[in-house]
């Protein structure tokens, strides 16, 4: 088992939810967390515990973003006008690796991060290899010509159901995606409920 698959399984098991909607998620087979003490019955979480869990779930969904980087995203969200929770989701969905994942150019958020890191993606015609790069409205993201025949890409596109979110305009033949607008929370296709308001409460303690 690769480290990325192991990490995904751990996150699902710890959360007790299939946060990416994968058919092979371990929570489809059992309801307890990872480790030797995973089968113990969980007590009711405190308010802090509920907030922490919401933060860990959101961090995990976007590929286990490090705490320092995730907190920096929250700080930026809190400085923007409007609802901080909505701003947080908007900033996370503007990450280049998230856009590549949403466009279904690769199968997972973990693969998207590696794909960007290895220089397979261009934004407005220029190569960008920073997964956290903030895509702007109107930007065009594309897979580099030399990378379009990679097995990872071909398999992902072949399996894609084309149900990309409305805020992206995707051409799977050309492997391009235009970021049309910053999404609202209810537009983001999360397989499970995300609660950015609890994340805001966690950091506002």
Curated annotation (Swiss-Prot):
Q: Is RNA-binding among this UniProt entry's keywords?
A: yes
Query: Any S-S bridges, and between which cysteines?
Result: none
User: Where are the stretches annotated Disordered?
Assistant: 19-45
Q: What processes in GO biological process is this protein linked to? A: ribosomal small subunit biogenesis; translation
Q: List the HAMAP family.
A: Ribosomal_uS4_B
- Residues in domain S4 RNA-binding? 94-157
Family classification: Belongs to the universal ribosomal protein uS4 family.
**GO molecular function (one):** rRNA binding
Protein name stated in the entry:
Small ribosomal subunit protein uS4
Matching entries from SMART domains are given as: Ribosomal_S4, S4
Say what the protein does.
One of the primary rRNA binding proteins, it binds directly to 16S rRNA where it nucleates assembly of the body of the 30S subunit. With S5 and S12 plays an important role in translational accuracy.
Q: What is the lineage of its organism?
A: Bacteria, Pseudomonadati, Pseudomonadota, Alphaproteobacteria, Hyphomicrobiales
Q: Tell me the Gene3D superfamilies matching this sequence.
A: Ribosomal Protein S4 Delta 41, Chain A, domain 1, RNA-binding S4 domain
Q: Quaternary state and partners of this protein?
A: Part of the 30S ribosomal subunit. Contacts protein S5. The interaction surface between S4 and S5 is involved in control of translational fidelity.
Q: Which InterPro entries match?
A: Ribosomal_uS4 (IPR022801), Ribosomal_uS4_bac-type (IPR005709), Ribosomal_uS4_CS (IPR018079), Ribosomal_uS4_N (IPR001912), S4_RNA-bd (IPR002942), S4_RNA-bd_sf (IPR036986)
Q: Which UniProt keywords apply?
A: Ribonucleoprotein, Ribosomal protein, RNA-binding, rRNA-binding
Q: Output a single Gene Ontology CC term carried by this record.
A: small ribosomal subunit
UniProt keyword Transferase, yes or no: no
Q: Which Pfam families match?
A: Ribosomal_S4, S4
